[in-house]
From Swiss-Prot:
Pathway: Purine metabolism; AMP biosynthesis via salvage pathway; AMP from adenine: step 1/1. This is Adenine phosphoribosyltransferase. It holds the Pfam family Pribosyltran. NCBIfam families: apt, PRK02304.1-2, PRK02304.1-3, PRK02304.1-5. The lineage of its organism: Bacteria, Bacillati, Bacillota, Bacilli, Lactobacillales. Belongs to the purine/pyrimidine phosphoribosyltransferase family. It comes from Levilactobacillus brevis (strain ATCC 367 / BCRC 12310 / CIP 105137 / JCM 1170 / LMG 11437 / NCIMB 947 / NCTC 947). InterPro entries: Ade_phspho_trans, PRibTrfase_dom, PRTase-like, UPRTase/APRTase. Homodimer. GO terms for molecular function: adenine binding; adenine phosphoribosyltransferase activity; AMP binding. Its EC number is 2.4.2.7. One of its GO terms (cellular component) is cytoplasm. It catalyses: AMP + diphosphate = 5-phospho-alpha-D-ribose 1-diphosphate + adenine.
Amino acid sequence: MATDFTKYIASVPDYPEKGIMFRDISPLMADGQAFHAATDEIVAYAKDKDVEMVVGPEARGFIVGCPVAYEMGIGFAPARKEGKLPRETVKASYDLEYGQSALYLHKDAIKPGQKVLVTDDLLATGGTIGATIQLVEDLGGIVVGTAFLIELQDLHGRDKLKGYDIFSLMQY
């Protein structure tokens, strides 16, 4: 029987600002069986894609990506904010509601031709994941799939990821 993962998501109105419904994954992470089952769902999605590396953006992409990489017996590379990686990096900028941000990946994190799964907790507007994909591709990696615990459908992030395979465990 399939797990109803939505019962492990806390919906917090007006956070971080009025009019926003925040979807908190903390209860899912706090329940070992549910978190393991959610990880297994993403692993099942990725199994037939010959994934060789998982990449996730700071910070909740680490929470999703690391256990997936562990279960698959492959590596994980973190896409971080400025100043967080100690060696030579590549950079991808993306738009925020007011301004811009950027993510960085070590230049040697991805080998040319390496098949990569990009993971995050949430697909909203697609900006963060779009930048993460750009980093992977700038290094010659091939994004064979993207996986999320939650997709906020009203924000149309899927539209920014046209041409990429998208898996989301829950949709709101």
